[in-house]
Amino acid sequence: MADSQDDKLYKAEYAKSGRASCKKCKDNIAKDSLRMAIMVQSPMFDGKVPHWHHFSCFWLRAAVQSPSDISGFTDLRWDDQEKVKTAIESGGATGGKGGQKGAAKGEKTLNDFAVEYAKSNRSTCKGCDQKIEKDQIRVSKKTVDPEKPQLGLIDRWYHTGCFVSRREELIFKPEYSAAQLKGFAVLRDEDKEELKKRLPAVKSEGKRKADEVDGGVSKKQKKEDEKLEQNLKDQSQLIWGIKDKLKKFCSINDMKELLIANSQEVPSGESNIVDRLSDCMAFGSLKPCETCKGQLVFKSDAYYCTGDISAWTKCVFKTQTPDRKDWVTPKEFSEIPFLKKFKFKRQDRVFPKDAPPAAATPSSGSTTSAATSVSSASKNLTEAPADKPLTGMKLLAVGKLSKNKDDLKKFVEDLGGKITGTASKAALCISSKKEIEKMSKKMEEVRDAGVRVVADDFLTDIKESGKALQELISLHAISPWGAEVKVEAPAAAAATKSTGAHSSKSTGKVKEEEGGSKSKKMKLTVKGGAAVDPDSGLENCAHVLEQNGKIYSATLGLVDIVRGTNSYYKLQLLEDDVQKRYWVFRSWGRVGTTIGGNKLDKFYDKNSAMDNFCGVYEEKTGNAWASSNFTKYPNKFYPLEIDYGQDEEAVKKLTQSAGAKSQLEKPVQDLIRMIFDVESMKKAMVEFEIDLQKMPLGKLSKRQIQSAYSLLSEVQQAVADSSSESLILDLSNRFYTLIPHDFGMKKPPLLSNVDYIQQKVQMLDNLLDIEVAYSLLRGGVENNEKDPIDINYEKLKTKIEVVDKSSHEAQLILQYVKNTHAATHNTYTLDVEEIFKIEREGEYQRYRPFKELPNRQLLWHGSRTTNYAGILSQGLRIAPPEAPVTGYMFGKGVYFADMVSKSANYCHTSQADPVGLILLGEVALGNMHELKKASHITKLPKGKHSVKGLGRSAPDPRATVSLNGVDIPLGKGMNTNIDDTSLLYNEYIVYDVSQVNLKYLLKIRFNYQTSLW
């Protein structure tokens, strides 16, 4: 598995055997010789593996910028450290095996820079994003794509001028010259001369003169650097002197006993034992971690803790100055000459200049701000996406904008995005209406690619506004074309060859570059209590064993944000449908990808198969299969309360045959189909990053969702209290394990900011309603007399009638829709397709006591289509007690609006799915507590019955009409002259669901703007 503290792209060590072969030349790497690796994503499990190379072959594939990029560099012998440094400084040229000579005499070719004549006009300059014409000179900086490191160095091409202007940024060092570029020798003579002028080497004399200008400061710095270098050399020789003697004079058992005698944990592997022992003998025995009492271990730039702060999370403590005690050699080792003569001398370990100082991660009692308490130990943690709103997006700029190209590029990159020059690669285009009218060739490419165009003030708004990305895109869209913008997920590692089969064992496959992160669709065959995993190849001839009411099937999860892992493990005991044959099938990998593998073990008696199943389960979880109380252990999997879609087939049959015998009016039939549309539910879950393979619709338990709410409450409180990053990390790991997410190859993001936590709260709100809808669908499947649509209609326990659009009440509602469409919601218009009158069973009786309150209004409430089965069957609900309070502007209540488009925005429709549902409810507001800014209401002031958030615009009160004693504020929007409010439009909140009586349900079509004129 990937090391929890080491996420570096490269690794160096001495070969432990002579079995490994070089990935470049395919020859074996001799034992004890220096070998270098590029770390790549394993296709077999959720972690990284080294691709080893001979030292000389390595530099033909890697572009190392600094020794600190290499894990294990400081553990090398001094001479080998110098060798690596020299290779880095010379651009990877080693002069050894595989080395290449440059064009100029005595100069070596730089392996990570190249020059050539462009072979076509398809390449794009990485500096200016413009095309490089065929036969034009282009210069490349070779880099490793972090998502596909196994591909080695990849050319990133530049125009000559663009490369020259970025010389320092591209680390083309002053001492490098054009003559050292790979391919320089084959250029035409005149081009060679021109390139030499533009990319000259800076002479060393010039450097010395510059140093003299700085005077004593540079001399002093140089002296300090030389002293540090000598100290590092002496330190390396001391450590390796100890290592060599330990290997020569001590057995492995002797070394283990020495570690135990000095209260140190004994690691696995001879090299690890020697490393730890030499460190302790040189600098002193390490005291336990001050945070978790775990074992500290030296790794390249600091001492890292290998312990755990909880059963869910590894400790992230690291330091360069650990507490130590004197090394003690037990008397029984006095017969070993080396140990008898060894005299311990206390000293501190010296670190290279480029090693960042390691600050210890604050413990749970720290008062450090949560925003800044992330230690360097966890610098690679992925922050919540809300921090950089354009993360994963490529933008194209067309025409003259308010910012020049360089400023725009920096601005976009600061927001997490990238600028591209190719329309087909862009998610969004920044331009102006003038450019659209002009319709240049570039804008034609944008239109043909279907890329939405937004005005350039979109960038300013997204930086300063707290609004959602999609909402801002809709607000600033200026093109008559363009689909809903999707954020691009980083590509996974390139696919490797696989011999996957349904036999004894299969290898995994890494996703294709453009494959995104969606799990493959599987047809699940349900037999008895659970579905047989189709990857077993036995779905047609076997079933999952069920004994004493227990189904022998388990899905396990393990998330570690520090490691970047998001793993699953599936286990099933299968019994032949006819014969007495048994199999234990297991599969594993990374959630949301095809990374992983599987294994099928065959047994001829039940007891042997059960023993194997129980043994694997206990190995992976630390718990016995028969145990009733599960205990989570560090680095062990956690069982998820899910299954492979029990009742899925029955639900499909129910929905597919719907409508043939229905007694309902056609518009009501269509409404029921819409509310119970399983595909819409699945789309919603995918939108929430839920992994449908591990969390299918059929098994969204309320208990699981409520536990997830509680975790979000805890993490929200931790962020608010500026708790330690370790606590937030722990809660994040637990949340993602409980609710499996599909992040593809991205690291699971830390739940470290309020906006991202609120996104997850909204996700759980919607999952609760989806759970209700699916539970209703599964119930009452047996009735063959009634039409499935009628059965589902009855489950809602709501009387639904179609309202004639020519009726008085319908005309009032249509006027209400027309007049209260807010001016700022100008990216769509609304058409009312159907109006339904609704009457929820028992709701009027509940509402009757509040009917006596003054100020009853008919107000809007919008929600996703997938939520309406829950809303109609159970009513509008207040967020559960487990849910965090953050994100609710006026506390936990039921929210309404008097502007139709304010509520319509919560329908979450799109151009691809433009039909939504919106409610009109009679709300007993009584005496309102009026507010202009956020206030977390837990109890209303005495004499108040509701809260009104005052907006800057509202329906003209003079046009309010009454229908059966209920006010309908259907006037056109007007300025309220309230300027000191944080709300654009009014909000109404009640804190008792009994104050709501749902009256109408509207089916509305969103007409997204298709024309600018």
Swiss-Prot record:
The modification PolyADP-ribosyl glutamic acid is found at residues 413, 435, 444-445, 464, 471, 484, 488, 512-513. Residues 541-637 form the WGR domain. Residues 219-353 form the PADR1 zinc-binding domain. GO terms for molecular function: damaged DNA binding; DNA binding; NAD binding; NAD+ poly-ADP-ribosyltransferase activity; NAD+-protein mono-ADP-ribosyltransferase activity; NAD+-protein-aspartate ADP-ribosyltransferase activity; NAD+-protein-glutamate ADP-ribosyltransferase activity; NAD+-protein-histidine ADP-ribosyltransferase activity. Its main location: nucleus. Residues 284-326 are annotated as: Zinc ribbon. A zinc finger (PARP-type) spans 10-92, 113-203. Keywords: ADP-ribosylation, Allosteric enzyme, Apoptosis, Chromosome, Cytoplasm, DNA damage, DNA repair, DNA-binding, Glycosyltransferase, Immunity, Innate immunity, Isopeptide bond, Metal-binding, NAD, Nucleotidyltransferase, Nucleus, Repeat, Transcription, Transcription regulation, Transferase, Zinc, Zinc-finger. Gene3D superfamilies: 1.10.20.130, 2.20.25.630, 3.90.228.10, BRCT domain (3.40.50.10190), Poly(ADP-ribose) polymerase, regulatory domain (1.20.142.10), Zinc finger, PARP-type (3.30.1740.10). Belongs to the ARTD/PARP family. This is Poly [ADP-ribose] polymerase 1. The lineage of its organism: Eukaryota, Metazoa, Chordata, Craniata, Vertebrata. The gene is parp1.
